[in-house]
């Protein structure tokens, strides 16, 4: 049942990125190596069927680190939210916002989950498998099954074996600060100043320094960096949280807003922000459309880099993505020559092309 649920997670990742994909429901063999693409609508229907079966089979009382049946409910809620905002993927008759609510509220009402008191600690080994965690990958330096620390730890932040490739657009950081100037989540999410582990020299990137070269123009994403500066191994042991309770509360806020449950929607946002000593900003008070825009930004402030950014940006369609993500970035007054200009071509930015390696080895795919 857990393997079925994990398969659904991966199917969802694939269909979100590529749309129509080969849908494997049996293992390939010598007589079954090639598979034509199935419509994304059929892939989502299969995910729903599998997740419903996983929910019925998964245990409610396994030990620490094991996902419970409520992870399947959260997956179902996420899928129904996608179908609610993409009518061509659904059956044309279901109230997908209500279905999403019904699944998400099961997780909340289970009483199994709560917010971890310290936001930044979620991204350390001491914050692993907390009551906030709904589905968490168990990673180990000994098992050598995670490169997150190596890829996200800035250059010379620790003693060795890292690259520090991944930064955050300055416009994303600026938007976060503009909405919540004193947000404790800023320190848990971004890094822009540190001393090198080898010689104690200062390293500054934006906003701790000016934007006079590309490397210095964007803060690092700190969530998955190795926090132990004396660590020198290639792999590390910080787990990766796939689903957590704060995400569920924001989902319930978005869903409740679409169902005109105004007070309930605001209550979920208040729970998430109360953890970090904040209250909902003025955009939450401007009616359904204003609340919708605010909650879509809130996902970014709370969950940046945790696996849902690309989909949340695109889930409400091309025009919403263009007007709420791409153009605000491209027209940012703080933008300079060290910023990327985001593409606006719908045919190129909504879905990825099937990789050439798959096209050339699968006789039933030609594009």
Model segments located where?
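Acidic/polar-rich alpha-helix caps and helix-coil junctions
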Residues: 1-148, 184, 188-190, 194-367
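Active-site-adjacent substrate-recognition loops and nearby beta-strands
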Residues: 148-154
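Extended polysaccharide-engagement surfaces of secreted carbohydrate-active enzymes
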Residues: 151, 174-178, 192-194
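Short, cationic low-complexity segments
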Residues: 154-173
């Amino acid at each position: 049942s857990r393997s079925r649920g994990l398969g659904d997670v991966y199917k969802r990742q694939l269909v979100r990125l590529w749309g129509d994909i080969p849908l494997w429901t049996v293992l390939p063999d010598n007589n079954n190596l090639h598979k034509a693409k199935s419509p994304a609508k059929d892939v989502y229907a299969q995910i729903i069927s599998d997740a419903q079966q996983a929910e019925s089979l998964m245990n409610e009382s396994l030990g620490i680190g094991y996902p419970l049946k409520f992870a399947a409910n959260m997956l179902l809620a996420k899928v129904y939210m996608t179908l609610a905002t993409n009518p061509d993927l659904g059956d044309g008759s279901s109230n997908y916002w209500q279905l999403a609510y019904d699944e998400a509220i099961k997780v909340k009402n289970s009483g199994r989950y709560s917010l971890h008191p310290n936001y930044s600690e979620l991204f350390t080994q001491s914050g692993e498998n907390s009551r906030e965690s709904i589905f968490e990958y168990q990673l180990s330096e000994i098992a050598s099954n995670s490169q997150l620390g190596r890829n996200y730890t800035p250059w010379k932040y620790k003693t060795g074996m890292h690259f520090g490739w991944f930064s955050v657009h300055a416009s994303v950081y600026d938007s976060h600060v503009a909405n919540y100037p004193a947000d404790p989540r800023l320190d848990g999410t971004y890094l822009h100043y540190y001393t090198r582990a080898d010689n104690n020299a200062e390293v500054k990137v934006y906003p701790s320094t000016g934007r006079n070269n590309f490397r210095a123009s964007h803060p690092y994403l700190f969530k998955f960096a190795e926090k132990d500066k004396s660590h020198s191994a290639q792999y590390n042991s910080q787990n990766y949280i796939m689903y957590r309770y704060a995400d569920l509360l924001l989902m319930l806020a978005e869903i409740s807003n679409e169902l005109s449950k105004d007070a309930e929607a605001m209550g979920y946002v208040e729970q998430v922000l109360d953890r970090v000593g904040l209250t909902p900003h003025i955009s939450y008070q401007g009616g359904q459309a204003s609340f919708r825009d605010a909650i879509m930004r809130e996902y970014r402030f709370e969950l940046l880099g945790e696996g849902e950014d690309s989909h949340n940006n695109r889930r409400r369609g091309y025009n919403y993505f263009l007007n709420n993500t791409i153009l605000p970035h491209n027209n940012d007054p703080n933008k300079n020559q060290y910023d990327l200009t985001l593409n606006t071509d719908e045919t190129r930015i909504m879905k990825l092309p099937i990789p050439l390696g798959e096209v050339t080895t699968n006789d039933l795919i030609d594009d």
